[in-house]
């Protein structure tokens, strides 16, 4: 599976690992937050290096649906159920700031994007009630939303809420431009460097897979913070969702707005212009990472829905993305606990990273260079509601229960031996010499790795859509060979009989 955005000849080539070992700021992660932060700091005259464990945009940003919208499904009414209107308005102002900065930047740089009307639609009476709540909160928060009964979709819609003047982007073209701009201001971007730890002394020692560096400031711009200070992995629920690009049947009429359902399962829709005509992009059908019996089934349901309503459309790409939802629904950002004010981070964008991610980059940069926006101050000083605290308790109780159940279950599975060869495209978990092991077969290659996540030891589950090992506790993911892909883990999986790889 490869996203429409990543399926291309990339114009980006990684910088060589620098000889210089000290920087003003080391940015960890080359997605939208990390790259905007690196650009703003480089422009200020700082010496900045970006370390990316995989490739630029390889994780969330390169797998997004690319919507830059202030109309975000049921997000605002959910926030209002936990916070004052002042806090909800601050969230909206943050997203306005992120959206405005990115749209202005793309216009200045000549990067194409399309302005579109964003539409949240309901297909049930219950969904209609939720939509009316969202409309009321949206208006209270200053958004000029309005209702429509003709959403232009090829299926029945009870009601639709619209917000004009939003945008859709090609996320990798955005990152390409940011990368060129960072380098033009003296910044360095190095792929294939996995940051594993950050010290607490000043200057801070940054331990990586390629050696140690030091920095006055470190920015963690990863999906989930890779440091356990603050225990944010206990406050975040990892979600995987699915997307596909389809070429519509010749002559068919495809709606041009950006759509999102308020009913479950979530269904998202937009177009993408190409030389051969518009592609239709659909998404949704998500689940908690690592906990679906068959992730492929979720993807198949999405494709079935798209083909039902757009008959004759040809699938060109399918992919998946991982996002993190905070238990209190508000993104976490700012100074990491026990980081002496020198480690900053952002996480919990809950599928709205194009606006939230840029907003967090603006706030982090202000923290480093001096100053802060009113919206950031309001969000930082919010009080977690009883509802948010209860959700955190539920999340962690469920995680502990899952770990206990999985450890008991693995002992009843068939034993793993050197002769265990799963069917093509499948993976199995069992005991190998008394320890949990995971064996998979992908493209004829059989691989055995530890079935214990390198983060906190969760028992991994096989992802039959992406052919990966996923942790059901906090969302870390690994290749069949045990190489780290994403999540709070900082090391590859152990190989039975060899220890850490």
Give names to the regions the model predicted.
Residues 23-50:
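N-terminal Rossmann-like FAD-binding beta1-loop-alpha1 element of flavoenzymes
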Residues 43-63:
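Glycine-rich FAD pyrophosphate-binding loop
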Residues 1-25, 43, 483, 490-497:
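Extreme N-terminal leader/targeting segments of oxidoreductases
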Residues 165, 263-264, 292-301, 308-395, ...:
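C-terminal catalytic lobe of FAD-dependent flavoproteins
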Residues 2-8, 74-79, 103-177:
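Flavin (FAD/FMN) cofactor-binding and adjacent substrate-gating region
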Residues 244, 424, 428-501:
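Rieske [2Fe-2S] iron-sulfur-binding domain
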Residues 129, 136-137, 161-216:
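Helical element adjacent to the flavin cofactor pocket in flavoenzyme catalytic cores
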